[in-house]
Amino acid sequence: MAYSNKFIYATLPRTQRGQPIVLGGDPKGKNFLYTNGNSVIIRNIENPAIADVYTEHSCPVNVAKYSPSGFYIASGDQSGKIRIWDTVNKEHILKNEFQPFGGPIKDISWSQDNQRIVVVGEGREKFGHVFMAETGTSVGEISGQSKPINSCDFRPARPFRIITGSEDNTIGVFEGPPFKFKMTKQDHTRFVQAVRYSPSGHLFASAGFDGKVFIYDGTTSELVGEVGSPAHKGGVYAVAWKPDGKQLLTCSGDKTCRLWDVETRELISEFPMGTAVEDQQVSCLWQGEHILTVSLSGFISYLDVNNPTKPLRVIKGHNKPITVLGLSDDRSTIYTGSHDGAVTNWNSGNGVNDRVSGNGHGNQMNGICSWGDFVYTCGIDDSLRQINIEGNSYTDAVVKLNCQPRGIAIFREQNIIALSCVKEITLVQDNRKVFSLPISYEASSCAANPETSELAVGGDDQKLRIYSLSGTTLELKTELEHLGAVTDCSYSPDNKLLVACDAHRKVVLYAVPEYKVRLFLIALSIDV
């Protein structure tokens, strides 16, 4: 049976407290870019459900930027490698790969003529490099700053200039080509986190962890003035110019974004983003009519200049690895749980999603299952918890388990939830434990067959065990040998087949109820 990719429900940007991230804007105004792990995510601004993922980096990617023409993207990773790749073809054909220095790349900027690229970061031998995009040939030297450089930008008009913002609290100014050190600006008292030219190049702005934002002349680099006094109560992570250059957006660790008039450097409006630590704002982008910000939680907010107290839209999801996935009874909703304990519900047709609220596990989840009006989850906090679907929040129902659960399955007619745990198999009925069966192996997963009242349990001892449910007790029926630790198992929707996979990437299909092998193959994945 042929299959094809229908939708990509993309990850959120990977964030880290105290670290700004960089959003890349499409010069055509259609898409925006960010990174997570080894991937670059391209998302449509109007419809974020339309997404593409570039996965050719071999280590975590820190930043990606479109060329001014929009035909190429340059992405830089933790090892100091730059990949320049095509945006037109779905295959994203690699044009060039360079290694400007050894160490994390933190920011990238293209010259307006698409010919030159400047990259900055935390190299072992230098903190920045400027080179030709076509050949990799050096076109100058980025020097004069004594600590890692966090941000850079090319002046989008002639005469070309490059500006850099460093952890030595200075702004570097370079003239060229070939680019040579011209001066440093020392108005900041803490790390400079962002430097950006206005769209015309007449001005540039800088932002730092001292909470200050300064505006400079784009040609002479003379200080024009300070924005606010200071601009924020916390560190400023990023700035973004309005396309006409008349307004400036700043985002801060004080959990606000602020909009400033460039000419008067006075506050126009403030966008309060919340009160929790996760509401710190670590990046922003002004793309046409859209104003985007990213919070420490990874949520992407579309700001409304006419109503600063409420965003137009908030894109939610996960920015940590997804460890569990389940479907609603009617298969219209997907439930996912991640490494940090967050649970998200997704509309399976269009990707619209929301984060489940309430007191959850707070750490890695190992199982999730939908049943009627509720979703049940288990995690490494050794508990079974309940989510009310209508309220989209956790309830107060919590069942404490004797050891860590690894899988969850439900016998609906019997009103029983089965949990395969590290040291035992536990049955729960009406939110209380009714049976526990000690086991001599470490269970990894389980699946319930309501027609035969059987529970399949995968173990690390290379066996798949089938238990019979009688009332509220379990009895061992049979053992099925595998060549490696069984990692997952699942019954087919009609309960006529059971599939199991193991650590050796073997997938075995059994016929129920005799559990005779129907199919044996080697898979590319070990999850079912």
Regions found by a protein language model. Give the residues of each.
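WD40 beta-propeller repeat blades
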Residues: Q99, E122-R124, Q186-F191, S200, ...
